[in-house]
Amino acid sequence: MKKLFILAVLMLAVATTQAQKHHGVYAIGFYNLENLFDYTHDEGKKDEDFLPTGRYQWNQTKYEWKLRNLSRVLSEMGTEVLPKQGCAVIGVAEVENDHCMSDLVAQEPLKKRGYRYVHIEGPDHRGIDCALIYNPKLFKVDDAKLLPYIYDLPADSLRATRGFLAVTGTLAKDRVTVIV
């Protein structure tokens, strides 16, 4: 499913660049990090399950293992089409905080590609956010903001949840906004 999504995005990118007479192909990806939590408590967040004494007995060893595996997978995204480059941007979901993102891009596979990230702490009571990983050689960030999720029914809006991260920047001389 993820490969089909990347292929569809690549085909769209090629069609867009062809129509605008720009030449170049850029991979854009998305990955659900599936609860990338560190093992320390964030005040005001319901992250107790991901503490050493919590439900998952989350600890440094498990955290570092997950970081290594995620960084390998993320660094390989887009390389079937662009082996030396990989993805220009990768939207990610279910990350706890800025600390987790910093630790993730510091892993050797992502560090070698020079990836950076954009993360804005959201209102989700569980501490689950979205972020954007990007290659600064390919994508220049101009602006980032968190857009709230608007519920259809007022009764549903009593629960704070993660919003959408909107990052605007330049890719291949075109201004683009990526929403995660």
Question: PLM features: residue spans?
Answer:
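Bacterial Sec-dependent N-terminal signal peptides
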Residues: 1-23
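Active-site-proximal beta-strand elements of phosphoester/diester hydrolases
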Residues: 27-35, 143-145, 175-180
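N-terminal, active-site-proximal structural segment of metallo-dependent hydrolase catalytic domains
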Residues: 19-108, 118-128
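Structured beta-strand-rich core segments of catalytic domains in phosphoester-bond hydrolases
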Residues: 95-175
